[in-house]
Amino acid sequence: MTSIVFMGTPAFAAPILESLIKEQYQVLGVVTQPDRKVGRKHVLTASPVKEVAVAHDIPVFQPEKISGSPEMQQIIDLQPDLIVTAAFGQFLPTKLLKAAKIGAVNVHGSLLPKYRGGAPVQYSIINGESETGITIIYMVKKMDAGDMLAQRAIPIEKNDDTGTMFDKLSLVGRDLLLETLPKLIAGEITAVPQDESQVTFAPNIQPEQEVLDFFTKTAVEIDNQVRGMRPAPIAYAVLDGKRTKFWDVTPLADEVVTQAPGQVVRKTKHELVIAAADHTAIAINQLQPAGKPKMTITDYLNGAADKFATGEQVINK
């Protein structure tokens, strides 16, 4: 039986680990982030991957940083045939990579060489890609730069967000890994180097990227940003003087407007349309003013009877 050490943390990685266990690979240990305090009550919470491991009585290692940790030597001492990572988020030292007898492989959420880095799904949506996918690669010291073992693309639908794409890609990654590992173990697979001329990067999302800019971004680009930031951290703008999270919007492709960016195009009881760059317009469907719950635009406008006149500047630079 082929032995594996699995490394991962979020919900994306949990079905992948579950499938390895069900397929009768010998999972010697699981490496995941330490338990974190979650929510307003700061409840100490295990990662989704740890929950799977504990449910199957698999030893769990939780170093804050694996490089140089006591846990690293313990993992090396397990002498696994394979190391498999999925959304682990840490570099693995060469010494650890070499501990796997067959190799160390990573399940990455993009069509490499595009979108190397920690936020490939988010950038695929923000940049308006029509598809993304999973690439299984050998792990090397350089980030997401290893030779490719397998790749599979799936479409990004117009209503997909980062949450729905993570759910879809998790299952694609699970299935592709289960198809790939037997060939890898049998020596029946030829790894393909990545084309370095096509490399793009997807570094972790920074706070300034959460801000919606109606003055330089078109309605479609704003919609892409909103969906790329959902379900977290949620994109925002200052609307009517208040920091407001935009949960759901619709770009109005057929409308060419004369209002300046950030001005009201129209308002009804159930609709608020705001101008964006290049004479485009966007309808706001769901939002969340600071300190308040998420609400529909209808509920929001109920409390704003005398506001949002056509042409009013409601979003400022």
UniProtKB/Swiss-Prot annotation:
Reactions catalysed, as given in the entry: L-methionyl-tRNA(fMet) + (6R)-10-formyltetrahydrofolate = N-formyl-L-methionyl-tRNA(fMet) + (6S)-5,6,7,8-tetrahydrofolate + H(+)
Domain of life: Bacteria
PROSITE patterns: GART
EC numbers on record: 2.1.2.9
UniProt GO molecular function: methionyl-tRNA formyltransferase activity
Binding-site positions, (6S)-5,6,7,8-tetrahydrofolate: 110-113
Keywords of this entry: Protein biosynthesis, Transferase
Function recorded in the entry: Attaches a formyl group to the free amino group of methionyl-tRNA(fMet). The formyl group appears to play a dual role in the initiator identity of N-formylmethionyl-tRNA by promoting its recognition by IF2 and preventing the misappropriation of this tRNA by the elongation apparatus.
PANTHER family: METHIONYL-TRNA FORMYLTRANSFERASE, METHIONYL-TRNA FORMYLTRANSFERASE, MITOCHONDRIAL
Sequence similarity: Belongs to the Fmt family.
Annotated protein name in UniProt: Methionyl-tRNA formyltransferase
Organism: Lactiplantibacillus plantarum (strain ATCC BAA-793 / NCIMB 8826 / WCFS1) (Lactobacillus plantarum)
Lineage: Bacteria, Bacillati, Bacillota, Bacilli, Lactobacillales
Gene: fmt
